[in-house]
């Protein structure tokens, strides 16, 4: 065994892995990050970055930020033209008024109420998942703070929260609006990275989850360069192009194996998905835990790619109605890429939903949806679940990744999880990494 004085080895140089690594390093730990990719990911991070991360890691917000587009979304209208929604609530209402005066009149109130509900989730997301069986004073105080936050928002917000979280996004939007294009834009946020249709229960929660960190009236996650920024900050060593497996003996993680080399560490932190993390550790795990991890719903449904685009930075949403989204899901439900896929395009990048696999004609169908020729679209091979598990009501908070193990620790002593497969899930950049680091520092 190679003697290496690492206090921690972090597997994965994504936003969560790097956030965990830098928190540990700032606490005086010697940290090695191991990542199988040869080059850093040049893509922007999609999702809210809690301000605590920027402040506590002393990140320059000017270099880690990305200019957000305005309008924040555009969608083609059936009769020609586009519906554009802006960061200014009143300006969006003016745009909506051209297609539905009734919807325009409700827009401001809808935005205000959704922002309040997303604020409740934000309060939950910057802490480890609540332990509902706890008797520890610190945990009880955290639960009390969240409850007080909700109470201060008023009776209507508490009613909205209890009523809306289990609803389908279609039910929520049908309560408020009549225009199909508007409901298609908003409904798409409710099924983002879910192999479910807009009429599935709990998709209203997914809608609010992706509203976290965004201003009122903006229902897509913000962008940042968090991963790129952390990768260049001093304090941790990053080894790229290196695939590692976790080494555990006697129920304790002792390091990782890279090729023929074994690197020792006091603890190991994995930002990989739970199934991958535990794949080689099953003989040391309880059968019930192995079963629970194997049953995590990780139904990949998104393919990414590129198109030549039109030079616009304004994201284009092709989801003309809730029915369109539901029919697109119907294909995926039976394992087929959608005949009419839900597509979002921003700059040169495209996001194709309900396409866990890429068939010969998918690129052409995506091109048709975008109104371009098929030679202008290139799709990447499907590559697993970006969120490391569906964000459904049975896989959030203290049930993520599995019930009983929501606090980033695992049955293997000295092995922790910090990826989006843990609370609060994907689409919240770095939050799981920060929460995991705080638990690790408290326990070790």
PLM region spans:
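Helix-rich C-terminal "cap"/substrate-channel and partner-interaction subdomain
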Residues: 109-141, 276, 284, 336-399
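Mid-domain catalytic core of redox enzymes
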Residues: 213-219, 236, 242-347
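Structural core of flavin- and non-heme-iron oxidoreductases
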Residues: 1-32, 36-39, 96-98, 102, ...
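Active-site/ligand-binding neighborhood in enzyme catalytic cores
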Residues: 115-233, 241, 392-395
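A conserved FAD-binding loop/helix module that cradles the flavin
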Residues: 420-441
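A glycine-rich dinucleotide-binding beta-alpha-beta segment and adjacent secondary-structure elements
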Residues: 179, 183-193, 321-329, 367-423
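N-terminal glycine-rich phosphate/pyrophosphate-binding loop and immediately adjacent elements
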Residues: 2-133
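A short, glycine/Asx- and small/polar-enriched loop/turn
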Residues: 79, 195-201, 247-254, 348
